Amino acid sequence: DLPLKEQIDVLKGMSAGEIEAAYHKPGPLGGHNWHPMSFSPDTGYVYIPALDMPFGYGNEPGFVYEEGRWNLANDWRLGMPTGEKSVDSKVDGLLRGFISAWDPVEQREIWRIQHAGTWNGGMLSTAGNLIFQGNSAGYFVAYRADTGEELWSAETQTGAIAPPVTYQVNGEQYITIVAGWGGAFALTAGAAEDYKLKPRGRILTYKIGGDVELPPVMDQDPIVPDLPELTAGEQEVAHGKFMYHKYCGVCHGPGVRSGGVIPDLRY
């Protein structure tokens, strides 16, 4: 992970003009959101699907209260994509997540599994020293509950945010997870380019000895329309960016990059 000061420097590079701003970590989604934790009586640990996401807060220039709007008076341009891949990739790299194995008696972290992305799934603890989690990278994974060692994984072809469940039928154990990229973060995650993060919802069930394979992904690339010649000036473009992030970006995505939950306005 980048030191906090370097993370702040990256985010400041995204600021819209000379706007007084503060960068907080975790952001408004918290260090842990609704994704269920789990507890293992075998280890005594709690397993937390944690979020590691900064957020930029700054005063919206000329804020005026509007009926029916969010009215947070925050400048949503802070931290939004610039269109420069070298800059935007650094900001995307700040959005992380991890599993924290926490000892509630000693009040300390025992081990941590770092994820490449944020908004990962809820946890399941089972007997046999196992924990399970689906993640935003499109995998369903089993770990050792005592050490965090990865033992098994299966590709889900979509991000998974729900917790898995386990049950028995005629004495045979199954584990089921509802896989699909969605929720508050996914609404504006701007992940439409990544096939694993598209909202391809399905119910996946596993058992020892199961041998069914998922069919190949058959997504069709979106048709990109021919863009009209830009006639607006620099100030008009900047104002349009401000208005978009104020009124549209919260659902349709930062920098007009939709997470795929609702239509992408670029196509």
Where are these regions (language model features)?
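Beta-sheet-rich non-transmembrane sensory/scaffold domains
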Residues: 1-226
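Electrostatic cytochrome c docking/interface patches
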Residues: 219-243
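Short pre-active-site segment immediately N-terminal to redox-active cysteine/selenocysteine motifs
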Residues: 236, 244-250, 255
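Gly/Gly-Pro-rich "capping" loops immediately C-terminal to redox-active cysteine motifs
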Residues: 241, 253-267
